[in-house]
């Protein structure tokens, strides 16, 4: 199971939001590139980047910083937030990004996502952000009626590289990852699932490890790393010991 540190970008800074609320922002670093290097030096084998400004604007807002991070870390990087057209995907892949995460578009513009999967096989990740099981879009500001499970199943056999399942109600709250919701999703689809949202302690990772066989391939950790509740080296060691 791969441990993936999260770097959320807003206004050129590394931040964390509480439950996706743009009014509840904590700035953890004014230098996201240095932050990315620090996680790499501590053993990160993959990084999860989110362009929060882009998720609201509908197009990239922190591309220069993302490019610098990709060039400086030397490990695979995934990026989400504001990716709404093929040219943006091409731009990110050209700068060395390994995977693009499509969230809002997965619900609102399926033909675009299908096209992206055809053009860039293995480079598209489905980002499913859910609140009480229902998918949220547009930077989590809009709630839909479709369930996370329904959305994931609808993208089977499309060449999706992975599904990142984020429980918004837990994100940034350090209340513990939604193990059951993630397990149900992983068992329902034949796509690797990455858990996200609410990871608080090493115990969360311990609870996810037995579910690798169910298809949970990784876990994204944000606030718990920045607050010091989890040491990245310990998390990686634990994940590799399984």
Curated annotation (Swiss-Prot):
It catalyses: 1-(5-phospho-beta-D-ribosyl)-5-[(5-phospho-beta-D-ribosylamino)methylideneamino]imidazole-4-carboxamide = 5-[(5-phospho-1-deoxy-D-ribulos-1-ylimino)methylamino]-1-(5-phospho-beta-D-ribosyl)imidazole-4-carboxamide. One of its GO terms (cellular component) is cytoplasm. It comes from Syntrophus aciditrophicus (strain SB). It holds the Pfam family His_biosynth. InterPro entries: Aldolase_TIM, His_biosynth, HisA_bact_arch, Isoase_HisA-like, Isoase_HisA-like_bact, RibuloseP-bd_barrel. HAMAP family: HisA (MF_01014). The active site is at residues 8, 129. The keyword Zinc does not apply. One of its GO terms (molecular function) is 1-(5-phosphoribosyl)-5-[(5-phosphoribosylamino)methylideneamino]imidazole-4-carboxamide isomerase activity. Belongs to the HisA/HisF family. It is found in: Cytoplasm. One of its GO terms (biological process) is L-tryptophan biosynthetic process. This is 1-(5-phosphoribosyl)-5-[(5-phosphoribosylamino)methylideneamino] imidazole-4-carboxamide isomerase. Its EC number is 5.3.1.16. Pathway: Amino-acid biosynthesis; L-histidine biosynthesis; L-histidine from 5-phospho-alpha-D-ribose 1-diphosphate: step 4/9. It is an enzyme of class 5 (isomerase). Keywords: Amino-acid biosynthesis, Cytoplasm, Histidine biosynthesis, Isomerase. Its main location: cytoplasm. The lineage of its organism: Bacteria, Pseudomonadati, Thermodesulfobacteriota, Syntrophia, Syntrophales. The keyword Cytoplasm applies.
């Amino acid at each position: 199971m791969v441990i993936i540190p999260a770097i959320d970008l807003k206004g050129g800074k590394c931040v964390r939001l509480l439950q996706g609320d743009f009014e509840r922002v904590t700035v953890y670093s004014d230098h996201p590139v240095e932050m990315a290097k620090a996680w790499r030096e501590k053993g990160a084998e993959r990084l999860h980047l989110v362009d929060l400004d882009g998720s609201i604007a509908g197009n990239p807002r922190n591309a220069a910083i993302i490019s610098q991070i990709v060039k400086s870390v030397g490990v695979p990087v995934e990026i989400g937030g504001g990716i709404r057209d093929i040219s943006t995907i091409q731009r990110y892949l050209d700068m060395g990004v390994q995977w693009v995460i499509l969230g809002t578009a997965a619900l609102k513009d399926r033909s675009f996502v299908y096209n992206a999967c055809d053009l860039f096989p293995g480079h598209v990740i489905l980002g499913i952000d859910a609140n009480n099981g229902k998918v949220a879009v547009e930077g989590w500001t809009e709630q839909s009626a479709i369930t996370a499970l329904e959305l994931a199943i609808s993208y089977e056999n499309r060449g999706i590289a992975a599904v990142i399942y984020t429980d918004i109600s837990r994100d940034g709250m350090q209340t513990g990852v939604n193990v059951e919701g993630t397990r149900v999703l992983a068992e329902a689809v034949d796509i690797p699932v990455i858990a996200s949202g609410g990871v608080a302690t090493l115990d969360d990772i311990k609870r996810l490890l037995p579910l690798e066989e169910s298809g949970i391939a990784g876990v994204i950790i944000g606030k718990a790393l920045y607050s010091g509740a989890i040491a990245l080296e310990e998390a990686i060691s634990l994940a590799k010991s399984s």
